[in-house]
Amino acid sequence: MTRKEQKEERRKAILMTALALFVERGYYDTKIADIAAAVPMSTGLLFHYFASKEELLLELVKMGLQGPGSVGDSGDVPPDLYLTMFLGKVFSFAEEQPWVFNMFVFMAQVRRVGMPEEARRLAQSVDAVAPTVKLIKKGQKDGIFRKGDADTMARCFWASLQGIMEEMSADKNMKAPDPGWIVSMLKA
């Protein structure tokens, strides 16, 4: 392994360790020394990779923004099938990359008041609800989804996914539910 590859592996180890500790203990209760000890490496060496805990936080938020994606335009695919396939992809990706479960928990934490403002603003910059509202309205128009406030329905869809990911983060033995179960709450 080259030095460059070793450095990238070390960087990834720091990020994954920080992610796990931030989810477990919270951002403010996790010290740089805790992260360094868990990697393991010296605190001084960790600062060669990240100048501060907030820089590390921002890097994790940027990773979270690149996650498994968001709901987009379904094209000719019926909205219920599209959402079912979307959830299937999210669960599949998370099972292949277990840190994704922690990332869902982490991103929810970062969006809360009291977190460093730059990280909070960045975490809030992605709107998953608006495209989901459009998709639900299309499904309502086509008679696939129940009548009701599409914004509330979209928020409930995402809250369900968030809750599932949090449970799977806490219980490593939990299996992903059938995506159809989640989509069925929207159906007429």
Features from the language model and the residues they span:
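Hydrophobic alpha-helical connector segments
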Residues: 59, 72-99, 153-157, 179
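Hydrophobic alpha-helical segments that form the core
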Residues: 134, 147-169, 178-187
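Helix-turn-helix
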Residues: 9, 13, 17, 21-55, ...
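Amphipathic alpha-helical segments used for helix-helix packing
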Residues: 94-116
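Amphipathic alpha-helical packing segments from all-alpha helical-bundle domains
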Residues: 69-73, 81, 115-142, 151-155, ...
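Short coil/turn segments at alpha/beta junctions that flank glycine-rich nucleotide-binding fingerprints
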Residues: 24-25, 97, 142
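Hydrophobic/aromatic residues within well-ordered alpha-helical segments
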Residues: 10, 53, 60, 64, ...
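N-terminal intrinsically disordered/low-complexity leader segments
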Residues: 1-8
